[in-house]
Amino acid sequence: MRWGFWFAIATLITICYAAKPLDVKIAATFNAPSFSALIAESLYQEKKEGFIWYLNHLSDLLDAENTTEKELYINVVNSLKREYVLSDEELSSLQFSLGLFSGAPKLQAFSSIVQSRSCDCDTWLQLDEESQVCFSDLPKDSPLFSKLYSKNPLDYEVVKTSATGIPYAVVVTSFERDLIPFHELYYKLALEGKCNYVIRYSPPSSSKLNSKLYVKGFGTHVSLKRTDYLVVDDREFPREKGDNPASFTSSRNKRSNERLFGMTSDSLQTVTPDKIAILDLLATQSIASSTDMLTAFRELTQDFPIYAHYLSIQPDVSNDLIEELNQFQSQYVPEGINTIWLNGLSLDLEETDAFSILSLIKKEKDMFDRFEALGIKSSKVLDIVTNEAFANEDSDFKFVKFHCQDDIEDWKAIHWVNEIESNPKYDNWPKSIQILLKPIYPGQLHMLGKQLHTVIYPIFPSSPSSLPLLSELIQFSRRPSPVQTGMVCAANDDDEFAQTVCKSFFYISKESGTDSALKFLYKCLNSDSSADLYSLLEEHLPLSEHDDDTLANLKKDLSSSFFDHYMSKSNSWVNRLGIDSSASEVIVNGRIISHDENYDRSMYGIFLEDIPEVQIAVAEGKISEDDNLLDFILRDASLTRNPLVYPSAKSSIKSIDIKRVLENVGSLNHEDILLIGSSNAKYSFWLVADFNEKEGLEILSLLADLLSENKDANLMLIQEGKNHVVPPLFAKLLSSPKRSSKHLQEILNSSLDPSSGVVNDMDKALKFLKKSKAVVKELGLTGECKSALLLNGRMICSFSVDSLNTADLKMLMQMEYDNYLSKLSNIAGSSRRLKNSRAISFLSSYLKTLESTPMSTSSPTKEEKLFPRDFIYNKLGVGNATFETDDFSKAYYQFVAVLDPLSKDSQKWSAILEAVSKLNGVGVRIHFNPKQTLSELPLTRFYRYSISAEPEFDALGHLEESYVEFDNLPADTLLTMDIEARDAWTVMQKDVDIDLFNIKLEHTSEAEALDSHTAIYELKNILVQGYSQEEFRKSPPRGMQLKLGNLTNSHVTDTIVLSNLGYFQLKANPGVWTLEPMDGRSSQFYEILSLNKKNSYKDPQVIVDSFEGVTLNPVMRRKPGFESADIMDEDLSSHKFFDKIKKSLSFFNFKRKEASINIFSVASGHLYERFLYIMTKSVIEHTDKKVKFWFIENFLSPSFKSSIPAIAKKYNFEYEYITYNWPHWLRKQEEKQREIWGYKILFLDVLFPLELHKVIYVDADQIVRADLQELMDMDLHGAPYGYTPMCDSREEMEGFRFWKKGYWKKFLRGLKYHISALYVVDLDRFRKMGAGDLLRRQYQLLSADPNSLSNLDQDLPNHLQHLIPIYSLPQDWLWCETWCSDESLKTAKTIDLCQNPLTKEKKLDRARRQVSEWTSYDNEIASVLQTASSQSDKEFEEKDNNSSPDEL
């Protein structure tokens, strides 16, 4: 985007007074909790001991009824310091949490489980669902306990005993003084073991504490607006009656007298082009020379537009700085690139916010605590997790090469589909391997006419997971590619159907070619097993073989030894490589990887990993032109694979922190457990099995033999939980003082029948069984994984002596040594503790759990884990262009940022880094990385971010309302404002006194009072989001419906699962929710197997208890009989499918008559809202049918939402607001207008309830002159939507018709280019064909180029006409003066006020001149609004007059 207009504005405005400040707030839908409760919650999250300390000291901390929040805060902080309850780092984390009000959602969530108050106190004992008892009503002689208790994840478990049958005391409180006697009573009883003591929160009854909660953790920006077309309303809009946000005045609402460069005016002044080029360098130099670099950084970047001129007249950049930057940018990070690490973890600059930083700090603190428990000092922790030995590889998991060629199977297993060296379409590709030495663009593959990159797809006809593999193989085969693809068709010996399919595939391939064979196989996999296989077979054979005799002989031939031989070779290949028919695995250059959401990245990563190895060999002459390149890659590959040892996906590996398990069961020193071998061993095996059974003893025998050969290994025996009989093995081991591997072998070689082992000490034996049960519970061994083998924390489930042998166990030990033990021994150096073998085994175990712990759960496409970490940040030097806090190297939490100071990332992160730098234990280092040459102004917006390192209070000691303030905005300049909030927030305008889309602030002088304009937004929802997939197919359950319910209503809201990543979003708010398949086809087809891919779906509860929202990863299992069915595959012409669904939708649980005409539209800014009123009037004017309007709520102003009811009532139409949060995985649009265009086209499948079959989009600035029922009834001839083609009858505009020349002319190839101002959508057809998914995929691809999709909402559907057909509406459905002749206006059914690039006429002027009825409509609407406003004034005055003094 070019900002030449900015210079024009700056030239005109040479003297400009200061503008009134603009304050921005976001209000939650729920009230603020009591501050005492917020402290309690934050302490509970920080450290449970701190929470209990707070309860014990409430009487001292709340020393008076009127203790202010500030006094309470100071008392708590000082007491925590004085009594060393929290470390300095924990105390800062607590203060940060309080400053963000991060505990408020958790406290609000209690409202979903706490019964309504029925007593006259703020703290009570909950006896049962209805009965509540105040302390004064408790009997003095014997305490009461709760009669019913249902455990809830929200509960504060103050004291929980392990004994059974102990009653519960459930105390509900606001954490004020009346909790004190309850706590003193029940805490004492709980410590005596007489009860379990649980606390729940309920807000206080005192109205003074029920204040509105204004949240933090969001950004907002005010941008200079493009003025190519003026879109400002020329009327003053009416304000709502009630509180006037313009009256908001703050103690902070004072202009600072100390500004950068000594600036005194908020004016935009010119910057010459030669100075623009070096602005980034000048900014770096100015910040570096400041005495307070962090503050200067934030002020300069956030208010850059007013500082640009002053920056440009600073002294020239020093040569020393340029030289330093040249060295940094050439060695480490290219110029202008932004990146931030926290202790080596790479942060997502866009997604990371204040709340996620708080969460990360807590995770880091937990990590430091665990390392400390392992005997490692905090100063050494970062040396381990960022050590280069770990950082360069995926420690416990790397793709091992296996011999995937089928020479061992006599070349009869693999069927090559895309055989590069023999396929004629590759004849023109270079055959010389020297081509590999030529440079190509990063990420590309050389177009070599030889087999190098190879992908082999195992296809099992009876497995649903094979269908997406086969689909991908077919797609690969349709286009030339440097990747050779093949497949192996395999089937179990007892699977007659699959065997016949594979044999038929071999036959068709031989007789009719690969294409026919693939089509046959696809149809077989895409139909159910009852399909007529031989009819499909006949369909794909040459016509000459369609006679009855040939087909009869064919059935016999398929049973012959010839095809049996091929089948056996295929199955032999699959078994040798350990391919599981249900695992959806693919072989890439010998590596066996999972076909999951990371498949593409893994595949290309393998290709790019192999290329350098081959290139070096070619350059050194180690490979000749005649050598097979794949053989070279596989020269050291293993012949066989055990998938238990080498799984195809890291996500399949489960890791356990074995030290934590031992701590939790009270056996850190091996109390009451059976340990074979030395307790001080590097290799710690745990075996969970039923030692009363032969299979458990057989695997134990293998391990005993292994231990006898390796003195550095020990073995812990754990009896499987289901059998409570003392195994004879245990009896013999318990009766002997020996616990060696030799003694174990002797026992195993002796008789182990039940009578052979006499238990001398039954109590001891029962303790062993009890301890085993506790360990099994800690390990989470349920369902399919009841037995397990662990080695230093890595867990293998579901094994036997047939699936795991001695060689496999030795390989596990070798992998453990290579990937962990050897590296940890080297890192340990002089650490005495790490020289202890047991400590190293514990540490290895813990590192594995870090490897499987995601840094964030918000995205399935980002696999960043807590370990290993990037070590490069340790190598970045410190120079003149670097800021660093004191004692950075000693900090627990080291933030290292590489930032271009004049970038949008810096506007946000300058505030965040400044705030976190105030926390104890936090170190901040910033390497400024400017672009050395700029061609345009880098920033054209003002920015603020709401964050504070601790709570802030006003002069009276009350918590100050959270807001951000723009106090440097230029007056009389057209601006536009927007909010940057995390993707889990649904934020809407609530109370605003200006047009935020077209801001023009009035100027004031310094002497004038500076009461602020205030924009109040509302946090309407916190989302539950997810990325779902089917259990075996690993593909999204597209079209599945999910419902979200609560404890009182099982169906509150619902949604559809998208094909894009299996994504879904559901609008929620803090509370306890349930997630289930929608009643109907979804519940018939699917059950939810798990909510997070690993844990079983025992409880459908979803807890929304933080501002971060909830991100799930559900796995769906198809129910029997629906394995191959398509949930969307039903006759949609009669709407049967959607008629079934709509009956269960939450939106339509009541009967209502559906409107005949459904119209949706979007508007932003008061002018377009004015147009929108008039559009609705024009629609109603030309129809007698029932009309309903659907308005996209995201962009509407509060004034519109307060006025539209009067319009709807006057003209008798219905309306409803719709919205959908832009998913964070879908590339966002930074300009608001382009975001609006995105909403017009990208979410049509999820914006509307499923009951809606058809909808018409009408631009807000359009005038309708026809009955839109005609458009609703129009046959779209199978297309999902209909658009009007662009007019070409106005000849003088021919030069502007871009679709008739260049790219579009070539692309369209005779197809029409359509305008998006009006279109009709068949929503049923749209959803059925997955049009929304296709549009979003193509958008994601094209939007990567910022110069594409100039008219997003219009270009995208036109670009996809070959996949999503457009029905061309008759030309008279849309007339636009810019493109259409004056003569055609006579028959126009709608008139669009589209822009004219020649005249750039204002919208209002054009409307009044061009549309004869527009002014009368406008006046009539104005009259309706005036009447409604007068009525509102009257009602407000009556209410005001009737109010009591207290209410006022």
UniProtKB/Swiss-Prot annotation:
Glycosylation sites: 66, 749, 880, 1046, 1441
InterPro entries, per database record: Glyco_transf_24, Nucleotide-diphossugar_trans, UDP-g_GGtrans, UGGT_TRXL_1, UGGT_TRXL_2, UGGT_TRXL_3, UGGT_TRXL_4
Chain intervals for the UniProt region annotation (Glucosyltransferase): 1149-1448
Class of this enzyme: transferase
Subcellular localization: Endoplasmic reticulum lumen
Record region (Disordered): 1428-1448
Basic and acidic residues: compositionally biased ranges: 1432-1441
Cofactor: Ca(2+); Mn(2+)
Major location category of this protein: endoplasmic reticulum
Signal peptide annotation: 1-18
Organism superkingdom: Eukaryota
GO BP field: N-glycan processing; protein N-linked glycosylation via asparagine
A Pfam family matched in the record: UDP-g_GGTase
Entry's EC annotation: 2.4.1.-
Post-translational modifications: Glycosylated.
Pathway note: Protein modification; protein glycosylation
Single GO MF descriptor: D-mannose binding
Cellular component aspect of the GO annotation: endoplasmic reticulum; endoplasmic reticulum lumen
Keyword Glycosyltransferase: yes
Subunit structure: Monomer.
Family: Belongs to the glycosyltransferase 8 family.
Function (record text): Selectively reglucosylates unfolded glycoproteins, thus providing quality control for protein transport out of the ER. Unfolded, denatured glycoproteins are substantially better substrates for glucosylation by this enzyme than are the corresponding native proteins. This protein and transient glucosylation may be involved in monitoring and/or assisting the folding and assembly of newly made glycoproteins, in order to identify glycoproteins that need assistance in folding from chaperones.
Full protein name: UDP-glucose:glycoprotein glucosyltransferase
Native source species: Schizosaccharomyces pombe (strain 972 / ATCC 24843) (Fission yeast)
